[in-house]
Amino acid sequence: MAIRVIPCLDVKDGRVVKGVNFVGLRDAGDPVELAAEYGRLGADEVTFLDISASTEGRATTREMVTRCAETVFVPLTVGGGVRGVDDVDVLLRAGADKVGVNTAAIAHPGMIDEVADRFGNQVIVLSVDARREPDRPSGFGVTTHGGTRSAGLDAVEWACQAVERGAGEILLNSMDADGTADGFDIEMIEAVRAAVDVPLIASGGAGKVADFVEAARAGVDAVLAASVFHYHTLTIAQIKDGLRHAGFEVR
């Protein structure tokens, strides 16, 4: 299977936040333009994280997903604030291909079963924000609230439980590595990879092409990044060339 390369965009009230500076785009805050641009540049998928605090903001994001689905021809994952089956239904109807779940699934793990039963495992991406917690059995713990609070769960055990309940994919985000550009947390990836057999996406810490190759060697099926793309540190083509050169299949 080809390794997928996935840019991630944070969306608030229907606009992209965090610096994104594509030259030539009329408005670097428009998620649809950016997603289309990433699609043209070879992205295999695009992930949106909705960080809107308000109901109105979420409604705006839904409209954005609909526009995106009409103009962007790569699979679209939307996460952030998904609280149950109804939210998943709304996003899928709007045009999302997959939906990311995180905090709500920690509070109500049965939600994973409900979504899987209704829509199929393939639509659920469990997002795990993990960091090193030496007292956990695996050495890695689950966090919430942007990494500021411990969820009291072992990251590997939680990933296994979620897969048993029907999660079709795991997005593993290292809160320690996130934003450092020092590379993915390879030990964490290897620990989760050894425990689950669903597709695994690595996130958090990428800074150079070698980081993506290292994650692929650790067994991930996809690599996700934000700032390296937004700030033009790396292009999708450079990452795919690096992976190809290292012997991995890419699309």
Curated annotation (Swiss-Prot):
Instruction: Give the first-level EC class, as a single word.
Output: lyase
Q: Name a single GO cellular component.
A: cytoplasm
Question: Which key words tag this protein in UniProt?
Answer: Amino-acid biosynthesis, Cytoplasm, Histidine biosynthesis, Lyase
CDD domains, alphabetically?
HisF (cd04731)
Query: Which pathway?
Result: Amino-acid biosynthesis; L-histidine biosynthesis; L-histidine from 5-phospho-alpha-D-ribose 1-diphosphate: step 5/9
An annotated GO BP: L-histidine biosynthetic process
Q: Which residues form the active site?
A: 10, 129
What Pfam families does its record include? His_biosynth
Q: Which top-level group of life is the source organism from?
A: Bacteria
The record's comment on protein family reads: Belongs to the HisA/HisF family.
Could you tell me what this protein does?
Answer: IGPS catalyzes the conversion of PRFAR and glutamine to IGP, AICAR and glutamate. The HisF subunit catalyzes the cyclization activity that produces IGP and AICAR from PRFAR using the ammonia provided by the HisH subunit.
Q: Which PANTHER family match?
A: IMIDAZOLE GLYCEROL PHOSPHATE SYNTHASE HISHF (PTHR21235:SF2), IMIDAZOLE GLYCEROL PHOSPHATE SYNTHASE SUBUNIT HISF/H IGP SYNTHASE SUBUNIT HISF/H (PTHR21235)
| Assembly notes | Heterodimer of HisH and HisF.
Which protein are we looking at?
Imidazole glycerol phosphate synthase subunit HisF
Q: Look up and give the organism this protein is from.
A: Cutibacterium acnes (strain DSM 16379 / KPA171202) (Propionibacterium acnes)
Q: What is the lineage of its organism?
A: Bacteria, Bacillati, Actinomycetota, Actinomycetes, Propionibacteriales
GN (gene name) = hisF
